[in-house]
């Protein structure tokens, strides 16, 4: 998933079964496969990949037209799953919120008194966020949550810019 073009072949000799995993386009291929039974809001998922000398973020996102609890929501840091999210996920949500707020305010789409919050935007979304950075700081030994504050602003900025252009 996080290494586009990498093929993994698993052979279960006891059951004489073979399974092949290959995501030619990385996150996009994974998102398409994972959402094959979902009625998506937009035809093509929003895909982004941005890197600097010290950090990188890649994400793919789409939304389900129907309320579902079983949607793919995954985050990674340096190929390590981060089920509790952390600063990269918070930056992603912040960027989504900023872009949507900007869009709605510019077009006067928000009713007076209605306040958007990030959780509303991601609540029915299907996404994968993958970050790579030097010397990541994790909260705890299990590496379930990233705690690198500088990376949050990078991810937020990249996410907002990507959605603003989209």
Where do the protein language model's features map onto the residues?
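Flexible helix-coil linker/hinge segments at domain or subdomain boundaries
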Residues: 150-166
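Long, charged, helix-prone linker segments
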Residues: 15, 148-149
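GHKL/Histidine-kinase-like ATPase module
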Residues: 2-143
């Amino acid at each position: 998933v996080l290494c586009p073009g990498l093929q993994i072949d698993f052979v279960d000799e006891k059951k004489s079964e073979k399974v092949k995993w290959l995501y030619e386009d990385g996150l996009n291929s994974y998102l398409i496969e994972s959402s094959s039974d979902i009625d998506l809001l937009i035809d093509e998922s929003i895909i982004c990949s941005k890197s600097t000398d010290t950090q990188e973020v890649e994400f793919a996102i789409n939304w389900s037209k129907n309320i579902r609890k079983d949607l793919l929501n995954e985050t990674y840091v340096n190929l390590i799953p981060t089920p509790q999210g952390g600063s990269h996920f918070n930056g992603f949500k912040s960027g989504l919120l900023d872009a949507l707020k900007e869009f709605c305010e510019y077009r006067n789409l928000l009713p007076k008194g209605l306040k958007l919050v990030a959780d509303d935007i991601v609540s029915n979304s299907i996404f994968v966020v993958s970050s790579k950075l030097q010397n990541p700081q994790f909260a705890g030994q299990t590496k379930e949550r990233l705690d690198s504050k500088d990376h949050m602003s990078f991810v937020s900025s990249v996410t907002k810019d990507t959605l603003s252009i989209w």
